[in-house]
Amino acid sequence: GVLSHCKPGTIIVDMSSVAPGTTQKMAKIAAEHGVKYMDAPVSGGTIGAQKGTLTIMCGADEETFEKAKPVLEAIGKRIMRIGGTGMGDAMKIVNNMLLGANMASLAEALVLGAKLGLDNKTMYDVISTSSGNSYVVDAKMKKFIMPDKFEPGFAMDVQYKDLTLAQEAARGVKMPIPMSATCTAVYEQARAAGYG
């Protein structure tokens, strides 16, 4: 694979979202070949990458992070070393766990509001200036729901994968996460209905 083509001292920057344990195993294998391995999952989507505004959550030792950072600045505005190997992936799991719950909660709230007779504009005007506001309200409701124009940018299958990574991580530290488990079940139902 890739390692057979790497010279000692090469840094592999893995920008996928995987379990921290997987990253730590890959880093150990890379180290056996004299190669550094840094996890660097992102938030901000395709548009963020095109505009160079991604948030990049890095897991690596300080020296590796500092060497790789200038390359990441081409696509990222906020490039942070979260901790050692796997910690970027851990942060991404926590972030996407919260994102998934926020998106599911917003969808549920808007359907309830509509069934109670509220229109989208009124709900947006109130929620966006009240305690229910969030990134999801600002970014998703304004962009997709208000203009009644939905263009998918993040597949439900990917969100589901991220939620299952959170479930796996929680089991690993023996922590129940019942809200996330319920949210994961909602995404699983949607996938089963063909909305992957």
Pin down the residues of each PLM region.
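Beta-strand segments within the central parallel beta-sheet cores of soluble alpha/beta enzyme folds
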Residues: V71, K121-T129, A181-A185
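Rossmann-fold dinucleotide-binding core
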Residues: P8-I12, S17-G100
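Interdomain hinge/lid region at the active-site interface
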Residues: T85, Y135-Y195
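Active-site-proximal catalytic alpha-helix in oxidoreductases
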Residues: K51-G59, M80, G84-L116, I127-K140, ...
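Short, conserved loop/helix-junction motifs that constitute active-site signature segments
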Residues: V2-K7
